Curated annotation (Swiss-Prot):
EC number: 2.5.1.46
Protein name: Deoxyhypusine synthase
Record-listed spermidine binding positions: 136-137, 243, 288, 314-316, 323-329
Lineage: Eukaryota, Metazoa, Chordata, Craniata, Vertebrata
Listed result of changing residue 238 to A: Strongly reduced NAD binding. Strongly reduced formation of covalent intermediate
Result of changing residue 287 to A: Reduces covalent intermediate formation and deoxyhypusine synthesis by 99.5%. Retains low spermidine cleavage activity
Enzyme class, first EC level, given as a word: transferase
Amino acid sequence: MEGSLEREAPAGALAAVLKHSSTLPPESTQVRGYDFNRGVNYRALLEAFGTTGFQATNFGRAVQQVNAMIEKKLEPLSQDEDQHADLTQSRRPLTSCTIFLGYTSNLISSGIRETIRYLVQHNMVDVLVTTAGGVEEDLIKCLAPTYLGEFSLRGKELRENGINRIGNLLVPNENYCKFEDWLMPILDQMVMEQNTEGVKWTPSKMIARLGKEINNPESVYYWAQKNHIPVFSPALTDGSLGDMIFFHSYKNPGLVLDIVEDLRLINTQAIFAKCTGMIILGGGVVKHHIANANLMRNGADYAVYINTAQEFDGSDSGARPDEAVSWGKIRVDAQPVKVYADASLVFPLLVAETFAQKMDAFMHEKNED
């Protein structure tokens, strides 16, 4: 009896390890990565992300979601729908999908600025939302460069040398001095126009004015004002722009920025859109400002988040798209995607697989307009 037991594995262990599987649905996707025996083909490599698993698969789903936005956007409007374009109170022509793009300031500090500028230059998005740094860093780069450094550089030594660190990017403090010299006369002019012409300034009007004044095609906001793409920044004073406005208020007080008018305008963009898509890089105010505008239409039809934030602390930055569904900020029948990744790595690849592939279609739309 003892010999027999030694020759047979325990039945309970066998049952636990070799448990029977239910059959998966026939449409289930098999995991398969890119085969480099095919040579180096970057399009095929990025397409293979979709079946690789983990965040690579989320990236593949984000590509599908953004392409769905674009396909909808390029659909022609009926004549009746086109006549209601003025309801958005925007100078932009209404399309079949209004795309909101939000991004945090560090992405403009980085080389993602050039990716965002490409989208704005070619009229591929309709509404921008960013923070103060997301505006000023673009303008400052037109005046002086940002440099690569190291995450490990010591703050004490950098401060002694007048160098500011943004992750592994370095911004000489002299850049902000040049920004002040450029900005102060514009603020003087804005105050004069407010007092003599009755101009009612808002953050979006101010950003458009700065984009016009910088007059540099390397700038995101040069192209935004040129293409009538509104830029909303409800926290416009939270950065160097705010510092300069503060200093200017002593020299030439009285400038007023009306955020209520901008609130009406961004919400109106969502309310009267045929459908909407959200692409949000990072979290915080840019993420929620776009999502809350889309609440006014019972949610966005398409949504892609790219950030590294987690939801366990209850922050809006880390909240998954499904939380936004519960608030009515994304529609219940939508298929939103969150990619848990650094946007500086992922976003250019996403644009390469989506907007950049549709360049000819966007150029055709522009020529027709």
